[in-house]
Amino acid sequence: MTIASERTPVLELRNITLHYGSVEALHDVSIKSYAGEVIGLVGDNGAGKSSLIKVISGVNTADSGEVIVDGVRRHWRSPHDSMAAGIETLYQDSGLAPDLSIGSNIFLGREKRRSGLLGRLGFVDQRAMEKEALEQLARVGITIPATQRTVSELSGGQRQAVAIGRAIAWAKHVIVLDEPTNHLGARQSAEVLNVIKSAREQGLSVIFISHSLPHVLEVTDRIIVLRLGRVVRDAPTSEFTVESLLGTITGLNESTGS
Amino acid sequence: MSTSVDALVTTVKSQSRVRRVVTNQQFVLFVVLIALILFFASRNSLFFRVGEFSNLFTDFSGLVLIALAETYVIVAGGIDLAVGSTAAVSGVVAAGWIQPLVNHGVNQAVILLVGTLACAVVGALAGGLSALLITAFDLVPFVATLVTYSVGAGLALVISHGAPVGYNPGAIYWSASGIGMITWLVAIVLVVAVVLGVVLHLTVYGRYNFAIGSNEFAARAAGIAVRRHLISVYVLAGVLAGLTGMFFYIRSGSGAATTGVTNSANLVAIAAVVIGGASLTGGVGRWAGTMLGAAVLTVVSDGLIFINVPPTWIQVVVGALIAVAALLQSFRRRSRRVP
């Protein structure tokens, strides 16, 4: 056992099993993540990565198993519950509402209301949201010229910047990033990796899902490999190379033993 | 934090101000509306009489609530084909329920309030049926509301036996009273319309409506109770259709199964929304657009009659209007897209 195990994990999943109809997406999956640590979650298509993060974020509910945050057993009835517990998730390609402004997207589900009676009637304070959205993005190192612009008017890189900025700005404990470097150029990807490193410095627990193995090896402290819904390897990143990681993902170096 | 993500950010070319105004659907519609009024007035000077404007407001009021109902539904990414027959069935049911009160000479204000409540309840039930089929049985909105449309139209015929239900001359009398060209009935409808606009654009409820229509998954992942919201939207649409049923009851003094059905009010309402610049894929639409769309359709329908165009041609003109509006929207979307 490593030193890390003496600390309380900020997020722990115990024996998670999830079915979609008769298909078993996750089988007895247990993982722990700690503050100030970046975990790489890798696996082939259909290995269960997206299913696992949907269990973490409350989009899906596991058939059995436990979700434990800061030592407390939790049950998510909806994504709202996990967000309230300080867990933010960046979904692959689909986390933003393209027809809403950048500011509205940053505050989606957390709209600021006007003060007094109007606020109680549900009136939103759009001006304050646009202003604070700029500040929040700037705080995590992202500058966007005008937040009133709708997301549909942004380039792919800009959308990703807004999505990452939103997740990091709100995350208190855990941030889950599903393929954040997808569709990005080399330079933009490097910047995203820098944002991940600074999230770790802030003391967040980061769960990073990617098909880009060099990115995973560069930025993570520990790598969890999923195959066909099971955890097949959970080890410090230093124990992997691109080749051995690829072998573990595909299962090709199973017979040789690793 | 020290990291900079400037590399992720490339400046978006902003389009010229002139182009932005010209491609603004509401602005174009406003110009079209004024032009239409001037055109009809130039062809027939009687068009400018107070009486004709009063008629325009009244016809507009019969359309605007279901058009706004349709705006909420379409912005949320759905469609509601049921609003026309919901108006019919609620008018017929309410007319039957309140006729005993009319016969007993109960105060007209009480009768109309009870009738309004009854229409709202029947409308809510119709909207609830659509919502149930969509959220619990996963039917697509088009099919689910087609079911509600058929059930509503059928029940309206069954209940009314194809004849007007009830007779309330007091309601007709009241429907004509008001100040100048605005009757009390129209004034009430306009107040409801304004409230709907405020809720759509200034409140959290309206914001969720846009978010769900724009990207349902993003809305769900952001913690929005999507299912509950969609149920409320279809029920709201049903209530507004019910109120429209009551509107026509008050104007004619009876409930009729033909209300909103024979004139395909559901399609006219959708046309108003589309002309107003909303996107049928959801997430895009404006209250002002629908108001102007409904106004343009009202002025065209009434104005063509005024200059002796056969009513049969009106639908052709409406079709052309929808085509122009849709083309304008597609042009605007292309001009805004970032390469």
Regions found by a protein language model. Give the residues of each.
Chain B
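Helix-loop-helix "hairpin" substructures at the membrane interface of multi-pass membrane proteins
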Residues: 111-119, 125-130, 181-256
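Membrane-interfacial amphipathic/re-entrant helices at transmembrane-helix boundaries
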Residues: 2-67, 102-115, 232
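Transmembrane helix-bundle core of multi-pass membrane transporters
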Residues: 137, 141-203, 229-232, 251-264, ...
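Cytosolic-side transmembrane-helix boundaries in multi-pass membrane proteins
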Residues: 1-38, 221-228, 300-339
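Alpha-helical transmembrane segments within multi-pass membrane transporters and channels
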Residues: 102-149, 292-293
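Transmembrane alpha-helical segments in multi-pass inner-membrane proteins
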Residues: 256-319
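Single transmembrane alpha-helix segments in multi-pass membrane proteins
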Residues: 34, 38-43, 48-102, 132-142, ...
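Structural signal for alpha-helical transmembrane segments and their membrane-water exit/capping regions
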Residues: 32-48, 156-161, 197-204
